[in-house]
A protein has these predicted regions:
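Beta-lactam-recognizing serine transpeptidase/beta-lactamase-like catalytic domain environment
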Residues: 5-6, 34-35, 113, 221-233, ...
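Periplasmic/cell-envelope proteins involved in peptidoglycan metabolism and beta-lactam response
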Residues: 1-302, 324, 344, 349-352, ...
Length: 604
């Protein structure tokens, strides 16, 4: 029994000893942390960290979910209407329907500017015109071009400007060109990308009447963006149809005659204006050289435009209203009336031509004596002086009247100011005076300047239109008109409005007897013994004046001729200028003679 107890006790003793050792070991481990922490504290700390991380994960997940929900609410509730509209816009489309410009016609209904059908190829914010042939080929390749925007864009029906009468009308009609940002200004709502607007001439001056009002088409498209259903259409409205004062046949005839004489004289340029002296209406206005304004109807190629701009003869320049030249002897119409108005000469005044006069050391001669060796023409009154274009008479007139009277009188007859024609680019010309000469040339006004001005020289500069205008005033009761270029505009709704109303600028201060005296001189100028020899034996009486104007320091001269007819009841004034043409009677007068002979013929 003791043995068994010993074994038991020994085992218990061993176990007890082992337990104590383990207990001691555990106790040592719990106190063995280098930080002085017990293992139990470490386990508890680790559990806390895990809990914090878990909470962070929960919060992060919740935040992400909350953001997602808020975004969903924003898109569906707040922005839902916008997206709905965008979706609708992707389904509903608006096309612009291009409105054609109004036609331009002459006073007899002849079409001078019309519209021919073309297509406009539009892609995004760009557009260009293509011919009907090109458009039809595209449609043949894919009919959807008219109902759907493809890789090349979409085709719309449009028109292109056509000028059927050629270069005779280029300066007066002008042309159209693609609109620019500068052109738009504050009127951007009236135009579309690629629109063409007037850039010159009547096309530019009457842009607001000629341009149409674009329409719109609202329609639905299917998933392939093919037109499915038309919702509504606002039809485009064509622009107003403009009737000009121009006589197309006269315009063409005058251009042909001017061109013929310019080529015959072997010079390069000139212009002519025909006017109704009773109303101021312009019947014809030509400038040479000219250009084909049809080339501007589509995008002009760089080389073609460069050729026009760099041409030394400047075919784009409208010489009738923008060119300024010394008037030479055609100005004697004005200086005669100014002299009579001043009282320094009268219908009874006679000056003796002895071939030359002296002003100090300076000699002034009569052109006839200088040119033909004749020394004198004897005694002349104002009518005979006009008929003979006698320089000596007008030198003496200038000495009697003085520069201030000539300057004031010139302005009274519309010189030195624009006539007011509604075409852009008109030049006012120049009536020189003391202040101008001192400022520009740094010279005083000399007495010789007055003599030169009296015969249309010195620094006096005029346009052909101004000469036509004062010729008309001398022909009809001294009334100076603002030239009129257009008469009526007709709209698609049937309305017809009178436009560009001609108005009197003023009635010049000339008594009827003075005007009669000057007109008598103009009548004699076209009869035997006068200077307008191409009109000798003309079938109807006319009044005319020649001019041969010196310029620069060369011996070249500009050729002038101005005439009104019939003499007793004038219905037309015609003024012709041939630059560097020589004598007015030799070069410019034949243009007028041939044109008026045709104009008054029974064939027309």
């Amino acid at each position: 029994m003791k043995k068994n107890n010993f074994g038991k006790n020994f085992a218990e003793s061993i176990y007890s000893s082992s337990s104590k050792k383990n207990s001691q070991k555990f106790s040592l481990d719990e106190t063995a942390s280098p930080l002085g922490l017990r293992r139990q504290d470490i386990f508890q700390s680790s559990e806390k960290v895990s809990q914090i991380r878990l909470v962070f994960y929960y919060i992060t997940a919740f935040a992400i979910f909350a953001i997602f929900c808020l975004r969903l609410i924003h898109l569906q509730v707040i922005k839902g209407e916008d997206f709905s509209l965008k979706s609708e816009n992707n389904r509903v489309k608006i096309d612009n329907l291009y409105a054609p410009r109004g036609e331009i016609k002459d006073r007899n209904g002849t079409v001078l500017a019309r519209n021919d059908a073309v297509y406009r190829l539009v892609k995004e914010n760009e557009s260009r015109l293509v011919s009907v042939e090109t458009g039809q080929k595209l449609i043949e390749q894919n009919e959807a071009f008219l109902d759907k925007e493809g890789p090349l864009g979409r085709l719309f029906e449009d028109t292109i400007r056509v000028y059927p009468k050629g270069e005779a009308f280029a300066h007066i009609l002008g042309y159209t060109g693609e609109i620019t940002a500068d052109d738009l200004g504050n009127d951007s709502n009236s135009y579309l990308t690629g629109d063409r607007i007037g850039k010159m001439g009547v096309e530019q001056s009457f842009e607001n009447l000629l341009k149409g009002k674009h329409g719109k088409k609202l329609y639905e498209v299917d998933s392939t963006r093919m037109e499915e259903r038309i919702i509504g259409v606002e039809d485009p409205k064509i622009g107003g149809s403009l009737e000009l004062t121009i006589d197309a046949e006269l315009q063409i005839k005058l251009f042909e005659e001017l061109k013929k004489e310019i080529e015959k004289a072997k010079v390069t340029s000139g212009s002519a204006v025909a006017q109704d002296p009773k109303t101021g209406e312009i019947l014809a206005m030509v400038s040479y050289p000219s250009f084909d304004n049809n080339i501007f109807s589509n995008r002009i190629e760089g080389d073609a435009f460069s050729d026009l701009v760099n041409n030394p003869d400047n075919p784009l320049f409208n010489r009738a209203i923008s060119g300024i030249y010394p008037p030479g002897s055609v100005y004697k119409i004005v200086s005669s009336l100014v002299g009579l108005e001043s009282g320094k000469i009268t219908p009874e005044t006679r000056f003796v031509d002895e071939g030359e006069i002296f002003l100090g050391p300076f000699k002034f001669t009569n052109w006839f004596w200088t040119q033909y060796g004749r020394k004198e023409e004897g005694e002349l009154d104002v009518s005979r002086a006009i008929a003979r274009s006698n320089d000596i008479f007008f030198y003496r007139l200038g000495m009697a009247v003085g520069e201030k009277e000539l300057q004031l009188g010139s302005r009274e007859y519309g010189l030195g100011e624009k006539t007011g024609i509604v075409l852009n680019g008109e030049n006012a010309g120049l009536v020189p005076d003391e202040e101008w000469k001192l400022r520009v040339k740094n010279e005083p006004w000399y007495p010789g300047n007055t003599l030169q001005m009296a015969i249309g020289q010195s620094d006096l500069l005029v346009t052909p239109l101004q000469v036509a205008n004062f010729t008309s005033a001398s022909a009809i009761d001294g009334i100076l008109h603002r030239p009129k270029i257009a008469r009526f505009v007709s709209f698609s709704d049937g309305r017809v409005e009178e436009i560009d109303l001609a108005s009197e600028i003023r009635k010049v201060n000339a008594r009827p007897e003075w005007l009669a005296l000057v007109r008598e001189g103009l009548k004699q100028a076209c009869l035997t013994g006068g200077t307008g020899y191409p009109f000798f034996n003309f079938k109807i009486p006319v009044g005319c004046k020649t001019g041969t104007a010196e310029f620069a320091e060369t011996e070249e001269t500009h050729a002038w001729f101005t005439v009104f007819a019939p003499f007793d009841a004038p219905s037309i004034t015609l003024t012709v200028l041939v630059e560097r043409g020589g004598e007015g009677s030799a070069v410019a007068a034949p243009v007028a003679r041939n044109t008026l002979e045709w104009y008054f013929s029974s064939i027309r």
